[in-house]
Amino acid sequence: MVIQKNWQELIKPNKLQVTAGDDPKRVATVVAEPLERGFGTTLGNSLRRVLLSSLQGAAVTSVQIDGVLHEFSSIPGVREDVTDIVLNIKTIAIRSQTDQPKRMTLRKTGPGLVTAGDIGAVGDIQILNPDLVICTLDDGAEIRMEFTVATGKGYVPAERNRPEDAPIGLIPVDALYSPVTKVSYRVETTREGQDLDKDKLTITLETNGAVSPEDALAYAARIIQDQLQVFVNFEEPRKEEAAPLAPQLPFNPALLKKVDELELSVRSANCLKNDNIVYIGDLIQKSEGEMLRTPNFGRKSLNEIKEVLAGMGLHLGMDVPGWPPENIEDLAKRFEEHY
């Protein structure tokens, strides 16, 4: 159907190229190419917004500190004010295996640092940055805290984390639920065959360790896919099963691919076209000497073609029995549809 060409004939990335950062569990760079012109920005901006705002995570939503009535207090023997302690608590990275609120406790006597790793273990909760410093205790000082951990998405300000029946001394905390801490993207021009105006999308993202960068990107894409589904007001007709390639072909069906689909330089592609070399099967039967006798075809173009063919397990000067087949155009079309 003609209408299906709206989406079926658009260029799509073959696969994602993922490069891990210094901390593979937290940092990665993902490249998607080629994309139709303009799609790099469309997809990059959408994914970035969803990654930062819409993924589920866990965070501390409130804290109670023994002997403290409000966040503008100070604690004897503790070097940091309660305001600074709350700011540190806000950055505790948490992985939760439950969507139910949980409580964690911390109790420590000085002197020394109080870190997130000092928080008592809870079965469904994992602290991902145990070295995070919460406060510093002087000799003989003691501190006891109780934290509430909840799950959610995005950013929720402290005032929304105060329950109506909050006890005296409960201090609400800004909840940074998103497991994604940083996202950036850039769009560059790339090449697809002879087209030089395609997009290359590069996304660099960092998480707090609750989810891997690759999984975070996959979840964001799934969210976008699910949100867009409501706009599709039709069902696609079932794709007819493609006719199988003739089993009696005496040669590799990849030879039916046209040479203009190879990523060759403009000079090399034009030389092949001028020499009436249409299919890879035509090309590989040529010897190096024959190719070099082609007008405007030099050693640089020869080396380029040899390298491309080598990547396909082919080379110049091959003998191809049964080439060319009588119905080559029909077979080439069937090959294109099949693969």
UniProtKB/Swiss-Prot annotation:
Catalytic activity: RNA(n) + a ribonucleoside 5'-triphosphate = RNA(n+1) + diphosphate
Single GO MF descriptor: DNA binding
InterPro entries registered for this protein in UniProt: DNA-dir_RNA_pol_insert, DNA-dir_RNA_pol_RpoA/D/Rpb3, DNA-dir_RpoA, RBP11-like, RNAP_asu_C, RNApol_insert_sf
Function: DNA-dependent RNA polymerase catalyzes the transcription of DNA into RNA using the four ribonucleoside triphosphates as substrates.
The protein's Enzyme Commission number: 2.7.7.6
GO cellular component term of the entry, any: DNA-directed RNA polymerase complex
Organism this protein belongs to: Methylorubrum extorquens (strain CM4 / NCIMB 13688)
Region annotation (Alpha C-terminal domain (alpha-CTD)) ranges: 251-339
Assembly information from the UniProt record: Homodimer. The RNAP catalytic core consists of 2 alpha, 1 beta, 1 beta' and 1 omega subunit. When a sigma factor is associated with the core the holoenzyme is formed, which can initiate transcription.
Protein name listed in UniProt: DNA-directed RNA polymerase subunit alpha
Annotated segments matching region Alpha N-terminal domain (alpha-NTD): 1-235
NCBIfam families: PRK05182.1-2, PRK05182.2-5, rpoA
Highest taxon, organism lineage: Bacteria
Any one GO BP annotation for this protein: DNA-templated transcription
Domain notes: The N-terminal domain is essential for RNAP assembly and basal transcription, whereas the C-terminal domain is involved in interaction with transcriptional regulators and with upstream promoter elements.
Family: Belongs to the RNA polymerase alpha chain family.
Keyword annotations from UniProtKB, A to Z: DNA-directed RNA polymerase, Nucleotidyltransferase, Transcription, Transferase
